[in-house]
Amino acid sequence: GIVRYTKMKTATNIYIFNLALADALATSTLPFQSAKYLMETWPFGELLCKAVLSIDYYNMFTSIFTLTMMSVDRYIAVCHPVKALDFRTPAKAKLINICIWVLASGVGVPIMVMAVTRPRDGAVVCMLQFPSPSWYWDTVTKICVFLFAFVVPILVITVCYGLMLLRLRSVRLLSGSKEKDRSLRRITRMVLVVVGAFVVCWAPIHIFVIVWTLVDIDRRDPLVVAAL
């Protein structure tokens, strides 16, 4: 609908389309990943291994970058309404979406190159083969993902919505409008939902991966194995 109908081509809806596109690509890999876990091997060859692993990273980064840009977009709309007339256009939203995919390619393309299939214990595994020393590049990759796909976006989103709420609060106090007061409460709830959903969805996996990478834990512990 967003692609076909002109009325839907607002900056916000174009960002939503980008989220939907990233999620659709990720969904297309689920049958292969499900089969891998059920069969305990990778029967689909190296080409699909490269595609599936790179799409995972593309989805992670494009989704988070898009959500972050939506926060910046809302901040500009609320705090700088005059600038918003020039910034919040469909053409610029499309350009930003393209830039998001280009930035995500900085991770997605190397992942595609490093993804390989290897025999292991009578099965085939789809894995990332890092340059030597592999432990070092594996650790660097996980730290970079943690910073740029979680910590930095959370900071940007929190700052944007915090400034937006301060602006709306000052407007409400100046006008004393009950309608603006209700609007502030609605937007406050929306902010809590957006930031809360972001943290709830991404924090567990990012924290688990960074702890797994940096902390010396017993990987044979049944609780650790269960968490995997």
UniProtKB/Swiss-Prot annotation:
GO cellular component, one term: neuron projection
Pfam families linked: 7tm_1
Any one GO molecular function term: neuropeptide binding
Keyword Methyltransferase: no
Subcellular location: Cell membrane
Tagged with keyword Ubl conjugation: yes
Segments in the Extracellular topological domain: 39-50, 115-134, 213-227
Transmembrane parts of this sequence: 1-3, 14-38, 51-72, 92-114, 135-166, 190-212
Tissue: Detected in myenteric plexus and smooth muscle (at protein level). Detected in brain and intestine.
Alphabetical keyword list: Cell membrane, Disulfide bond, G-protein coupled receptor, Lipoprotein, Membrane, Palmitate, Receptor, Transducer, Transmembrane, Transmembrane helix, Ubl conjugation
Top-level taxon: Eukaryota
Principal localisation: membrane
Record topological domains on the Cytoplasmic side: 4-13, 73-91, 167-189
Disulphide bonds in the chain: 49-126
Record note on modification: Ubiquitinated. A basal ubiquitination seems not to be related to degradation. Ubiquitination is increased upon formation of OPRM1:OPRD1 oligomers leading to proteasomal degradation; the ubiquitination is diminished by RTP4.
One GO biological process term: phospholipase C-activating G protein-coupled receptor signaling pathway
Membrane disposition: Multi-pass membrane protein
Function: G-protein coupled receptor that functions as a receptor for endogenous enkephalins and for a subset of other opioids. Ligand binding causes a conformation change that triggers signaling via guanine nucleotide-binding proteins (G proteins) and modulates the activity of down-stream effectors, such as adenylate cyclase. Signaling leads to the inhibition of adenylate cyclase activity. Inhibits neurotransmitter release by reducing calcium ion currents and increasing potassium ion conductance. Plays a role in the perception of pain and in opiate-mediated analgesia.
Quaternary structure, from the entry: May form homooligomers. Forms a heterodimer with OPRM1. Interacts with GPRASP1. Interacts with RTP4; the interaction promotes cell surface localization of the OPRD1-OPRM1 heterodimer.
Family: Belongs to the G-protein coupled receptor 1 family.
Protein name: Delta-type opioid receptor
The organism of origin for this protein: Sus scrofa (Pig)
Gene (UniProt): OPRD1
